[in-house]
Every structure is written in C-alpha cells, then in structure tokens.
Amino acid sequence: MADKRQRGMAPGALIGCCLLIAVLSVLGTGYFYMKEKYAGSAVAYSHEQLRALDEGSFEYKIASRFYTEEELKNIRSNTVEMDPVDAPDENAEHEKMRLEHVTGSTYEGWMLMVYDSDLLKVAVNPAMDSGAQAPSLVDYVRNNHAIAGINAGGFEDAGGTGNGGLAYGIVVHEGKLISGGRNEYQSVIGIDKEGKLICSGMTGQQALDWGIQEGVTFGPTLITNFHQVFKEGQGDVPYLNPRTAIGQRPDGTFLLLVLDGRGPSSFGAKYQDIVDVMFNYGAYMASNLDGGNSTAMIYNGEYVNNTVSMYGSRHLPTAFIVMEDK
C-alpha cells in the first residue's frame, strides 16, 4: 500500500508568511493612525498636531502626504480658509445669500452672506414681558417663515434656568423699543432705516432717534470704518469658545458668522479670529454677538454648525433672521 504523506507548508515558509502578515498589519495600523492624527475628523486637533512638527522630521514627511502643498501652507501659516457651499448659479437673477465654510487654526465654522439688507430682521421672544421660556432658533426661523437665522443678543439669567425669557439691555424691533429703558445706555448692534449696520454705545432713546429699526445688545464692537477697534486684552475672554458675530460690507451685504467650539473638530475662537475672518470678507463694520452655548446658525431649515448641546440651540430672547421676502 502506497505511503500517503500529508503535504504542508515548510516551517520556514510558514514563519515567513506570518512575519509578512505582521509587518503589513503594523504598516496598515501605522498608516491609519497617522492619517487620523494629522488629517482626521477632529480637524482642529489634527491641524494643531501638524503645526507642532518640525518640517525636516520623518513624521512630518509622512503627515504631509495627506495634504496638497497649498493646504499645508495654509495650515502652517494659520490662514483662514473659505470654501463655498452650494455655490450659486452665476446667472441667477435673484440670489439672496451664499453660505461658505471657514476654517482657521483652532476652529471651523460658517459664514452666511446676505446680499439684500432689507431681508435681515430681529426676531423677538413674543412672551418677553412675562419672562416665559423663549423659543429656540429653529422656532424663530420656522414661525417667521424665514430661510436662515443666527442667535443674536444676550439674556438675563437671574435664576440660572437659561430659559432665555428676558433679553439683556436694549432691543429694537420694527422701529419700536421692545426692551430696555429710553435712558439706559448699552452697546447696541442695530440696523437703521437705510439698512446700514450700526455698532455703537447708545441709549434707548438715541437708538430711536438714529432710526434704528432692528437692534440687540451685545459686544464688543470689533471693526469700525475698516479699522480694528478691539484690542487684545481689553474685555476679551482669553479662551477659545464658540462665537457668533455680525458684520457688513460697504455694498450692504450682511456677514453672519458662527464659529464652533468646545469640540475635537473645533476648539473655538477668540475675538481676534472673528476680526481676521471679517476682514477677509471685506467687512467695514463688525461686532461680536452672544456666543458659547448660544452659538447657532440655521440655513434652509437645518443647523449647519455643531451646537454645543446635542439638542441644538438654547432658548433665545432674540435672533437675527433672514426673511424670504422684504
């Protein structure tokens, strides 16, 4: 009877295959680790890690393979990047707005350009006098049949409930003083009868006398007549936080900005970051609005930014909304 022997892989070949698999596994794991660290979903973290590398290092050479030369240059120099979203048809006759994604060294966010100044209004808590819980941003947009919106002024929170029922300071809506006294002096962000953005200290009576049609209280004012009026250290909260701001170009275009924060993809921004972004978009006037947990933007019925709360915007006493029609 023939001797039947089971043929198998030689011990040396088996060891070689095992070593090859191990090496490929290590290389694959290393690749995905490096990609997630330097070009991963946590954008702000990845950019921060990349900027910390020595350009001559082996690790930098690997990390640089995940970007184009222009992208590397922008990240290393902290340049603000602007990417169009749903770019409009150049032949559109009635384009109302344009949304762009912006990124910086520690943040990412969104800039909404509103080309018709008459479309921007202030929405006010209808139960302001009672102090009852205010609507959220999505409620303001939906209830007013608006097409976009951002949070606006500050709110009183004496009880620590955060219900946004009472606005802080002066609020003007449709040319009427809704909140604040006629002799009360506050930092007001307002829109006058000509659709111009006014960012200045004023009393409630002055707001009416100057023709403010829509306005809220917050600050500080960051840019006036193309000049940066905010100086680092003067009232600035020196931490990275979610930010909301409003600005305007000389042609009347309103600039509505939200910058995310308190997350791995966006640590947050300082006032100087707002100034830099606004200047990049040609603002001649700009002011900071309420930020932190309040920072939110809705566009076409959806939140476009990552709010601090997983449930979306907090309850707000006021919001800037973009109407469908004048």
Task: Report each predicted region and the residues it spans.
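Active-site-adjacent helix-turn-beta-strand microarchitecture at beta-sheet edges
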Residues: P88, F155-G235
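Extracytoplasmic
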Residues: Y107-G109, N143-H145, E184-Q186, T217, ...
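Short, solvent-exposed aromatic-acidic interface loops
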Residues: P126-G131, T203-A207, L259-G263
